[in-house]
Curated annotation (Swiss-Prot):
The keyword Cytoplasm does not apply. GO terms for cellular component: extracellular region. InterPro entries: FN3_dom, FN3_sf, Ig-like_fold, M28_fam, Peptidase_M28. Residues 411-497 form the Fibronectin type-III domain. This is Probable zinc metalloprotease ARB_04732. Residues 1-24 form the signal peptide. Zn(2+) 2 binds at residues 191, 227. Pfam families: Peptidase_M28 (PF04389). Its cofactor is Zn(2+). PROSITE patterns: FN3.
């Protein structure tokens, strides 16, 4: 008993000493006694090092008047109508009939084309529509017999830099539990009528005659063959590559239909954006890859720079969404149509809902037991499980990103940092974007700490193609971006030695 009392008194004395120590700390080291292991105990004034008084804070870019108008016109009701119409075709399996007027993927394709064409007819020639495709032979996997793969493509041609292209897509094919069942019902409301609905809605709104034309070209696509092996997207990406098209960004919207997880958790104001790290070897060879890793550039690939741009321009009160950038190609065991674009050498990223509910993806329509709870639940990718307001907000995120991309200058080329001599400053050089300097109002150097995910600082260096900054290249990550004549920011590019 005496030992217990002695131990308690010793412990009390220790806590009293700790409290006195905390009270004596300078303000910058202060911690809360309700949380004595507060993180500031392990921090110090040097935590923000390197401390520099250069440039300014890199704040989010506010949407322009034209963009605010676009965002205000994206309609949840139209999106719902599109999804229900696509579901009405019974199945949109890539192998399903292409000759039936009301059932199967052929009927769905013709309806999508007619909708794009309807918007084109109202656009005063701004929007053009075509169906492109090829005959895919049996692949010994999910294509057991030859089939026509068709993509529906609507193009809003830019005015100023029309050779620079941005692509947004959703896949209109669907499947149920059996990836080879091309006769059974496969509604595909979320996967991926939701993504197609966004492509259609953005084409409708952005092609209106009372809006200015974008500077760059925007392509709105509905592709097939995704569930069977990303065939339609691969065909589209390779078509762009074979024609040397300058695609500076691609987004796929795949499974963006629900804000509710399988446990009922709701995240109605969050969208995930998956962005790949190290590019495929066919895009950057081994020597280039080793060089990127050597300079710590594995987190500054074109796809991740594109994702940073989305975060900076599309996360605001007008979209009412948080863009959760995931530094990963895709979810585990899943794939998407951004991958063929990445493999073709284009920056690309995938939007997808915050939490998956696998009872409503790739499932036969049925009532069955929930393996977790044992209760009967409805299986199947049905419209009743879609959140149309959520989809419209995802559409707004896409619209904000695409419009800002298409109205800003393209990416600077041949961006370099001088490493010929040891120094504590950083000297950069670059060439204008592929479209030249016609849309450029100046250039900015941006930077962040090596552990920060997004740009934190910027410095406007004017209409130049080289600049030196009094901040060591060893201590931060730099990027160079073009700025439009009205302040529109472009995508930053990592400088290589």
């Amino acid at each position: 008993m005496r030992f217990l009392i002695s131990s308690l008194l010793s412990g009390l004395a220790l806590l009293t000493s700790l409290h006195a120590f905390v009270l004596a700390l300078p303000r910058e080291y202060s911690i809360s006694m309700s949380n004595p292991f507060h993180e500031s105990l392990f921090s110090c004034p040097a935590a923000s090092w390197p401390r520099v008084k250069l440039g300014s804070e890199n704040t989010p870019q506010e949407p322009s008047k034209d963009l605010r108008k676009i965002l205000s016109q994206i309609s949840p009701k139209r999106i719902e109508t599109t999804i229900r119409k696509l579901v009405s075709f019974g199945t949109r399996h890539t192998l399903s009939t292409q000759t039936n007027a009301t059932y199967g993927i052929g009927a769905a394709r013709e309806w999508i084309e007619s909708e794009f064409q309807r918007y084109a007819n109202a656009s005063d020639g701004r929007l053009t529509v075509k169906v492109v495709g090829y005959d895919q032979q049996a692949d010994g996997n999910r294509i057991p017999f030859p089939v026509r793969i068709s993509d529906v493509v609507a193009t809003l041609k830019g005015e100023g830099d029309p050779e620079r292209v941005y692509v947004v897509s959703g896949h209109y094919d669907s499947r149920n539990s059996d990836p080879l069942d091309y006769k059974g019902i496969a509604p595909g409301a979320n996967d991926d009528a939701s993504g197609v609905a966004v492509s259609l809605e953005l084409a409708r709104v952005m092609s209106q005659r009372d809006l200015p034309r974008p500077k760059a070209t925007i392509v709105f696509a509905a592709v097939a063959g995704e569930e069977q092996g990303l065939y339609g997207a691969n065909f589209l990406a390779q078509s762009f590559r074979n024609s040397s098209t300058n695609v500076e960004g691609m987004f796929t919207n795949d499974i963006i239909g629900s804000s509710t997880a399988d446990d009922g958790t709701k995240e109605p104001h969050v969208i995930r954006l998956f962005a790949q790290g190290i590019p495929p070897l066919n895009v950057e060879n081994q020597a280039m890859r080793e060089r990127r890793i050597m300079i710590g550039g594995d987190n500054d690939t074109p796809a991740r720079q594109l994702a940073r741009f989305v975060k900076e321009t599309a996360e605001n009160k007008h979209t009412d969404m948080e863009v959760s950038v995931i530094y990963r190609l895709d979810r585990y065991l899943r794939g998407g149509d951004h991958r063929p674009f990445l493999e073709a050498g284009y920056p690309a990223a995938r939007f997808t809902e915050p939490n998956g509910n696998y009872a409503h993806q790739h499932q036969d329509i049925r009532i069955d037991k929930d393996p977790k709870t044992g209760k009967d639940i409805q299986y199947g990718d049905l419209p009743e499980f879609c959140d149309f307001d959520f989809i419209s907000r995802v559409g707004k995120v896409n619209a904000a990103a695409l419009w800002n991309l298409a109205m800003s200058p393209g990416m600077p080329r041949n961006v370099r940092v001088n490493t010929t001599a040891l120094s504590n400053d950083s000297k950069f050089s670059w060439d204008p974007p592929a479209g030249g300097n016609a849309l450029v109002g100046g250039y900015e150097i941006v930077w962040r700490s090596t552990t920060a995910p997004f740009w934190t600082h910027k410095m406007d260096v004017g209409m130049v193609q080289e600049a030196t900054i009094d901040l060591s290249k060893d201590n931060v990550v730099f990027g160079i971006r073009a700025r439009g004549k009205n302040g529109e920011r472009g995508v930053a590019v990592l400088p290589f030695p």
